[in-house]
């Protein structure tokens, strides 16, 4: 028996394929997150809608506390805690004014809450770590503003705006510091400031010019590293800033993994800023100054370098979104 062919069949197959792809993408993890851009600080739900927001100027670091309060920078040197229900600042510390810094040029680009009795703070006291650029020191303060610890940093090209970018305490007596101006990542011993590991970020990883270029977007080029995290296997993941790449470096300083500017399909990495290691092993990469049509965040399965999620809200947050925090993945390393 002859069965007549259906002229609609090719179209139906295409539609089925597209639908399957759409369902697959919809099934992929969507994330609730907090970020800042276009003078707005906002929590975005997993569906991409604004859940909460308030006016706020630019930041370089952000942390949401267990009680939901938000810690961000205000201006160049102050760290504040915001109650999201009232949208009021309930605590602050200004590095330009406190603990011996009055009259000095100081900027703060990184800070980190240190919960009591944790791997990074074995004491009974809640602490806040603050990296002070200009005075080149890392301090830990309590709620009263009293300084409980201080650690000097080594800076080859001192400048209050470029001494540091993100800094993280990675053990009870260790700090991992991104030095933007020096183009280096250094690990310090708390108190003494001894450098026990360091890595000079290469000017070129993969494609790119052979010398630095000014700017902030895809046209810029250099080794102004922004973020670094220590991975559980002992390697260090580094966001190279205007190097347009992420590199994984082993303790012997060998690059063992990387993703470069145009390596991901339809994605252009610009000023690469933040890094998060999710519990499933995926990396979330901050992609700042990339321009319209490019994601602000990229979640990547590193082994296959497969993009599993992107956050693209350029129209809402603009071209300068330096930091964010994924809020629905407890246990992430950032």
What do the predicted segments below correspond to?
Residues 1-12:
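N-terminal secretory signal peptides that target proteins for export/translocation
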Residues 12-24:
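Bacterial N-terminal signal peptides
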Residues 6-8, 18-19, 28:
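Intrinsic disorder/low-complexity segments
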Residues 29-334:
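Histidine-/acidic-rich catalytic cores in large beta-rich domains
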